[in-house]
A protein has these predicted regions:
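A polyanion-binding, active-site-adjacent surface
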Residues: 1-175
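Acidic, low-complexity intrinsically disordered tails
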Residues: 1-6, 175-197, 238, 812-842
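Short hydrophobic beta-strand that contains or immediately precedes a catalytic carboxylate
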Residues: 42-44, 145, 208-210, 279, ...
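Metal-dependent phosphoesterase core characteristic of DEDDh/y 3'-5' exonuclease domains
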Residues: 54-57, 61-63, 121-131, 138-142, ...
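Acidic beta-strand-to-loop metal/phosphate-binding motif
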Residues: 105-113, 209, 275-282, 578-580
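Conserved "right-hand" nucleotidyltransferase catalytic core of DNA-directed polymerases
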Residues: 170-251, 273, 294-297, 312, ...
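Conserved catalytic core of nucleic-acid polymerases
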Residues: 386, 390-393, 457, 485-488, ...
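A common structural junction motif
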Residues: 785-796
Length: 842
């Protein structure tokens, strides 16, 4: 405790907020600890325990900051254990913090987390402002970063946190960044002579890092403009950039404004001919450049590389530069680049490519030690980015009339459900006084209606309330499904149906109606770095490159329900056919391969049905007597226990995913039957957990890593999740990577053959296509063969000795595609006859 500050600041009788009212003794109004006049003052959210202070000290020592010369204080001054500090508490404590800073006169302040950022510089958004330098009213310099608690919750943030501390150390000690990390030799291309000089320079360059600034997110908007373009170059044998060129384009102060699109086109060939072409999240830049006539492609993407090397870490350019290079954040505060001074825009743009180039060189050195990851990037991730650039620009066709019709039906279904629900609602005089209106969404009314009026049991509650009252009864869909199963009631049926139709109406059809363009297409964004497991995601929204605001682009195809009512609005336009090619039971097949589970491998090698086989085991019946429902239950067993699910969870999963009612006793018996039938899976599970504990990571057969620092977590639930991921990540990532590689191969094959057929995206383990009718006979067998024969052995030395099967379905619509017999796909005569019957023949 700093006695000088304590005597001047501490008010042991403070009752200014609920924290102070509960805190007692030394836990009330805790003031700064450390030297009277510290060079560096650290400000956190709450007073630290001894353990927390020692953990922070260890971080400081790691970057050569002496904890004994550093002071620490908190935004909220009282230490309590069951009350959450909010804005009111922060406001009540702010005079104490201000007085501490006034007395201690630190030269530097390190603000840990959002609360400290707000209290010291009045801003919000720690991920946006971390690593930047601000002026405090006292004259001190403030540098914000994340709190150590965020590192505990997400170990992937550790490297960035330590890098921020090292940056503060360097700033506060007067050290400067390395000479090669200084942005210099920048040329603003504002004349024809300089444009010619840039073109000549590109002819001799070995590599470029490029980046654009835009006036928005959607390149198809009528007013879409590229504000500026930056290109950083290097020559052969260089390990650092040599020059940066910034080209003002559509900015109001740009000399090229009247002809900026022509400048973009002029740079197409010079940029495309440079051997090495790098960008960060380059799919965005390539999409925009293609919209305006520049088809430059990537040979490397630093965001894709960052994800491949460590999927847990932040993948934004700024945190990567801070972590890998030790530089501070650079940013532009404007919300509209078109209204910001041109000089500021160009400087920001130049920093982007300058540091992209530096990050690229760091990654190249790291990849030299991990050639298997380099091959994954070269064979899959980077060419997939190229393929998805075109896929995103093309979009997926939507039957506008069907969409509008189904949107109307959804609203009518909701009204019908609400009308019936109202018949169960009692007269208003029976309602509690604090409830004023009917609300069938999760609300005070619906909870009273279900759990008090109808007296249905409460299965789960939310967090305990600050006053000690029980949390609200949960109306989560999973809990409602359990109620439906165990305590049937018409109201529960109606509420679950209401949830479905409400989701259809608002999350799907209303969103689609807003997003569909004049060509009846919806454009989405596919994210190759969207999940830590390696699976793709789509439509989650991209951050605007300037403001950081997240905007939705298209639909999340992974979440479109299998219900034909929704999927049926997607398809192919007249003269074309929608093709879906889906890997059959690919996770079971891959798991059998990884576990060397001979029973499973033999079933697949001999073409037997693994679900029927499991049903036979569960029922002691011959295959001929296994019913459809018994096979369905066996399917739930196979997929449910594949990754080691417990019996209790299986009861809920079987019901929610398959509509199968299973008792806990049955689930235990089914689990035993599963591992008795496939014993090597159990051994493989144990092996994966052991590998994760030993190496803190696991790998797929082709070397994609899943880093699992949480495997050592003291929290059982966190540790259990890491163990679960040690089992399912290698399987799911391998299956997803195989689909992406197949898409890359097919994308190139279609181009080489001059075909119009193209992919419209992936959904988990399936690839969807749009094909002209006259190309079906050629592309259907091509798609199936390519997906089943990805050259894993040639590229990665992996001999996949389990048959991989891709099922092909075709139709006018996604939801109504008809599956083709596998033998027919490979028989030209039968395929031609079938196409003719479907009126697909030309």
């Amino acid at each position: 405790m700093n006695l000088m500050v304590q005597s001047e600041v501490r008010d042991s009788n403070c009752e200014g907020c609920k924290l102070a009212q509960q805190a007692t003794g030394l836990d009330r109004c805790v003031t700064a600890e450390g030297p009277d006049k510290p060079h560096l003052l650290i400000v956190g959210k709450l007073p630290l325990s001894e353990r927390q202070r020692e953990e922070l000290n260890n971080y400081l020592r790691e970057v050569d900051i002496d904890p004994d010369t550093t002071a620490y204080t908190a935004v909220n001054k009282c230490r309590t254990w069951d009350i959450v500090a909010g804005k009111k508490e922060q406001k009540a404590c702010s005079p104490y913090l201000d007085r501490e800073i006034e007395l201690m006169k630190p030269e530097w302040i390190l603000a840990l987390g959002n609360e400290a950022l707000s209290a010291t510089v009045g801003r919000s958004g720690i991920m946006k402002y971390r690593g930047r330098e601000f002026d405090h009213t006292s004259g001190a310099k403030v540098v914000p970063t994340i709190s150590p608690s965020m590192v505990v919750r997400n170990p992937g943030q550790r490297a960035g946190f330590v890098a921020d501390l090292a940056y503060v150390k360097r700033l506060s000690s007067g050290e400067d960044i390395a000479e090669k990390l200084r942005l210099k030799n920048v040329t603003a291309v504002t004349t024809k002579e300089r444009l010619r000089a840039l073109i000549d320079h590109l002819k001799t360059a070995q590599g470029i890092a490029f980046d654009i600034e835009t006036n928005g997110f959607d390149e198809f908007r009528d007013d879409a403009k590229i504000v500026s373009l930056s290109i950083t170059t290097w020559m052969a044998d260089d390990d650092h950039p040599t020059a940066t060129w910034v080209v003002p384009l559509a900015h109001p102060q740009s000399p090229w404004r009247p002809q900026w699109e022509k400048v973009v086109r002029v740079l197409n060939k010079p940029m495309s001919q440079v051997p090495v072409r790098v960008a960060h999240n380059g799919k965005f830049d390539c999409r925009w450049l293609r919209q305006f006539g520049n088809r430059v492609s990537l040979t490397a993407d630093t965001m894709l590389t960052a994800h491949m090397l460590d999927e847990n870490r932040p993948k934004g350019l700024k945190p990567l530069a801070q972590t890998l290079l030790g530089v501070g954040a650079w940013d532009i505060s404007t919300k509209d680049l078109m209204s910001d001074p041109l000089k500021q825009v160009l400087k920001y743009n130049a920093y982007d490519t300058f540091y992209t180039a530096h990050v690229y060189f760091v990654f190249e050195r790291q990849l030299a030690e991990k050639p298997h990851l380099k091959k994954l990037l070269d064979k899959m991730s980077v060419p997939a980015s190229e393929a998805f650039t075109d896929i995103e620009r093309e979009g997926i066709w939507v039957d506008r009339e069907a969409m509008d019709t189904n949107a109307h039906i959804s609203k009518m279904e909701l009204k019908t459900i609400d009308d019936e629900l109202m018949t169960y609602v009692p007269d208003k005089k029976e309602w509690p006084e604090d409830i004023k209106e009917v609300n069938f969404n999760p609300s005070k009314f619906s909870r009273w209606f279900l759990f008090d009026y109808l007296e249905l049991p409460v299965l789960e509650r939310g967090k305990e309330k600050p006053n000690g009252d029980l949390g609200d009864p949960s109306m989560a869909e999973a809990n409602m499904q359990k109620l439906q199963r165990d305590h049937p009631h018409r109201v529960i049926d109606l509420l679950l149906a209401r949830t479905k139709w409400q989701k259809y109406s608002s999350a799907f059809f209303s969103a689609y109606q807003e997003q569909i363009d004049h060509n009846d297409r919806i454009h989405t964004t596919f994210k190759l770095t969207g999940t830590v497991t390696g699976r793709l995601s789509s439509g989650k929204g991209d951050a605007d490159k300037v403001t950081g605001r997240v905007q939705n682009r298209g639909v999340n195809l992974q979440q479109v329900p299998r219900d034909k009512f929704v999927r049926g609005i997607f398809g192919a336009p007249p003269g074309h056919v929608f093709i879906e090619c889906d890997y059959s039971q690919v996770e079971l097949r891959v798991a059998a391969f990884l576990a060397r589970e001979e029973t499973m491998l033999n079933l697949y090698r001999t073409g037997q049905d693994i679900h029927t086989n499991m049903a036979m085991r569960m029922t002691n019946k011959p295959a001929s007597e296994v019913t459809k429902d018994e096979r369905k239950k066996a399917k739930a067993v196979n997929f449910g226990f594949l990754y080691g699910m417990g019996a209790r969870k299986f009861v809920d999963t079987a019901w929610s995913n398959y509509g199968v009612v299973v008792t806990e006793e049955e689930a235990m018996a089914f689990r035993k039957a599963f591992f008795d039938e496939f014993p090597m899976l159990h051994r493989w599970h144990n092996k994966q957990r052991a590998l994760a504990r030993k190496y803190k990571r696991v790998e797929s057969p082709i070397g994609r890593a899943r880093n699992l620092p949480d495997i050592d977590s003291p929290h059982q639930t966190v540790r259990a999740e890491a163990e679960r991921q040690s089992i399912n990540s290698p399987v799911q990532s391998f299956a997803s990577d195989m689909a992406v590689m197949a898409l890359v191969l097919l994308n190139q094959e279609f181009k080489d053959r001059g075909l119009e057929t193209h992919s419209v995206g992936t959904v988990h383990d399936a690839i969807n296509f749009q094909a002209p009718i006259d190309e079906l006979e050629e592309v259907i067998p091509l798609i199936k063969h390519t997906m089943e024969n990805v050259p894993m052995e040639e590229w990665f030395g992996v001999h996949l000795d389990v048959p991989i099967v891709a099922d092909v379905a075709t139709g006018e619509r996604w939801g109504g595609a008809e599956e083709l017999d596998n033998d027919m796909v490979t028989d030209p005569v039968r395929l031609r006859e079938w196409l003719a019957k479907q009126h697909y023949a030309v």
